[in-house]
Amino acid sequence: MKKIFFVLIIIILIIIVVKLYKIKAKSNSEHTAEEFVNKLDELGYFKYAKKEDAPSLKKEMLEMIRKYGSEGTLTTLWDENTNVAKDYRFYFCDGETVFEGDGIPDLINDLQPSFEKFGVKIKIGSFSEEWDDEKGLSTQIKINGTEYEIFKNFKKSGWGEAPMRIAHAINKELEKKGINEKIYLISGGNDGKLVFLTEEQHKYIYAFFKDSKEKPLELNEWGKIMKTEPLNF
């Protein structure tokens, strides 16, 4: 009888400890999520969002961090009418789509809502793409008067190279204009995404998330992880 009573006491104590641990873990998760979102807000992450959209964007980010913590990734909400992220930072960047056809100029056109928020003009002057059966693909684009050679005699699948190189060109143009936002890439292939961040925002977000394939990366680091050819300009 005493043995049964002792076992019951042990079971009850274990249940109490487990419940207390879950409560503490939930509390820590809540604190971490609020701290993360508050820091993003402090760093100006939501400053381009419409005033009425900011609360829902913060809530969406809170829920992501509460659920996944540092194993998660950045998230956003989309305007149903324009299909543009309400924070004006986040975009899908499918490597296959960017590489093929007019994917490069199409991407620049897709990013125009953010450029408008930054108060900068990123204008395509010309775009040319030539394929040679022996030499491969050659692609040039002129942005704000500057010619960028994206590909020269390129014979591989450029699902990684195309997003990385056009992002590099855009970043150079933003830097010329004195804009402190630049493109960082997340994941790759058909799951690729890009996000505009300041260096300070990126430093904080990079340190918070653990998975290198789910957090925003500078272009050279992203290229190494995705095993792309290095930047050529």
Region roles according to the model:
Residues 1-4:
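Positively charged n-region of N-terminal signal peptides that target proteins for export
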Residues 6-10:
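Sec-dependent N-terminal signal peptides
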